[in-house]
Swiss-Prot record:
Binds to the 23S rRNA. Keywords: Ribonucleoprotein, Ribosomal protein, RNA-binding, rRNA-binding. This is Large ribosomal subunit protein uL15. Gene3D superfamilies: 3.100.10.10. It comes from Nitrobacter hamburgensis (strain DSM 10229 / NCIMB 13809 / X14). The gene is rplO.
Amino acid sequence: MKLSDIADNAGSRKKRMRIGRGIGSGKGKTGGRGGKGQTARSGVRIKGFEGGQMPLHRRLPKRGFNNIFRVEFAEINLDRLQDAIDAGSIDAKSTVNAESLVKSGVVRRAKGGVRLLGRGEIKAKLTIEVHGASKSAIAAVEKAGGTVKILAPKKDEGEAA
């Protein structure tokens, strides 16, 4: 027996059906697509159409809206801030603000400002300037001997001052 003698068992691999190759092929003329019309053509799918049944996107009610005045804060928790201080990317002696957090890479971008949240604990005595802070975060920073200054909301660059 040689490697070239090895073959599949008869009927174990079925040949694929080539459609639209004459009536003798068994899948000629319309090629399994039924009669004429839109769905007999290539690439046709009517998006959202469910065969006449009321489509899902029309059965469900409209909900909510997009507030154009929404302000998105970059959120930072106390444990993340403490990790950055331990790693040396933030100087505990200088004021911690949005600019220093972005510069150190702790926050990616602070377009709407930074909001301080209270998960974890802080050991360093810090002076923090942020645009928002939770009560628990303020309490934890003050317990460690630091201060939190809440800044006024950031104005849009496009807005007249």
